[in-house]
């Protein structure tokens, strides 16, 4: 993952703020890899020295995400999930993001990587106890995420993207559903990048993703991806 190596070098030289947001080093990129090869460097690149950071869904995160996240040496890094996982350097909190157990404006930056699509759906694959399913759960979750983000703070979200579909344990977003999510957040969109898997990952347009399905185009998992960076407004009337 070349971009993560680039970020690591910036970290060691104290220059994380100048590293810049993720850009595909080549197209196609990550042939034979899942959407994680995009999401992880994209999310990590959004960190600009914030003190209090929350990662939602950390307990089931891959080591290839947790390792670079921890390498950022974030002063106060919290993890929220339905189950506990002991990770040195992360303050574990067990809870439901739809009822986040944090005060208003608690965090400078919140990361929600391939997690939002599972909220409100059948999570027994990750969590033994079945929760009540709620197709609007993601909208409730994003409102809570916005609430616990400080004004002027930022939110990073990645979700599978293409044709809207309920797969039972997660939903794939389309333009309409993602716009509803962003609207519910009440935040400003700083950046939105779309990607499609076609013998590797490439930048894509909305039109190119309209009919993309999960595991389509011989993808190992998602064949379409949306990465969004939001900012909570500084003023209540924005």
Language model regions located:
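A C-terminal cap/extension of S-adenosyl-L-methionine-dependent methyltransferases
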Residues: 176-185, 190-238
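A short glycine-rich, Lys/Arg-flanked "PGG" loop and its adjoining helix->strand segment in the class I
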Residues: 128-154
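Acceptor-substrate binding/catalytic loop of class I
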Residues: 136, 157, 162-181
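Class I SAM-dependent methyltransferase Rossmann-like catalytic core
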Residues: 1-50
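A short beta-strand submotif of the Rossmann-like class I SAM-dependent methyltransferase core
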Residues: 109-115, 121
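A short His-aromatic
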Residues: 118-123, 134
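A short acidic, Gly/Pro-enriched loop at the edge of an enzyme's catalytic core
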Residues: 98-111
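Class I SAM-dependent methyltransferase SAM/SAH-binding core
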Residues: 54-99
């Amino acid at each position: 993952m070349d971009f993560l190596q680039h970020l690591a070098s910036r970290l060691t030289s104290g220059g994380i703020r100048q590293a810049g947001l993720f850009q595909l080093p080549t197209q196609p990129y990550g042939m034979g890899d899942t959407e994680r090869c995009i999401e992880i460097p994209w999310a990590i690149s959004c960190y600009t020295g914030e003190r209090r950071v929350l990662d939602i869904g950390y307990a089931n995160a891959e080591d290839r995400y947790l390792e670079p996240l921890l390498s950022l040496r974030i002063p106060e890094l919290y993890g929220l999930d339905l189950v506990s996982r002991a990770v040195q350097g992360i303050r574990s909190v067990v809870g439901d993001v739809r009822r986040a157990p944090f005060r208003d404006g608690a965090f400078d930056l919140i990361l929600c990587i391939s997690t939002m699509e599972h909220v409100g759906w059948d999570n027994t694959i990750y969590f033994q106890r079945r929760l009540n399913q709620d197709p609007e759960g993601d909208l409730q979750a994003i409102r809570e995420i916005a609430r616990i983000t400080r004004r002027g703070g930022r939110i990073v979200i990645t979700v599978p993207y293409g044709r809207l579909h309920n797969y039972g344990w997660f939903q794939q977003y389309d333009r309409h559903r993602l716009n509803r999510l962003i609207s519910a957040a009440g935040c400003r969109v700083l950046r939105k990048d779309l990607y499609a898997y076609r013998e590797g990952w490439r930048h894509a347009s909305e039109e190119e993703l309209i009919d993309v399905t999960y595991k389509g185009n011989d993808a190992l998992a998602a064949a379409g991806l949306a990465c969004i960076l939001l900012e909570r407004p500084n003023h209540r009337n924005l």
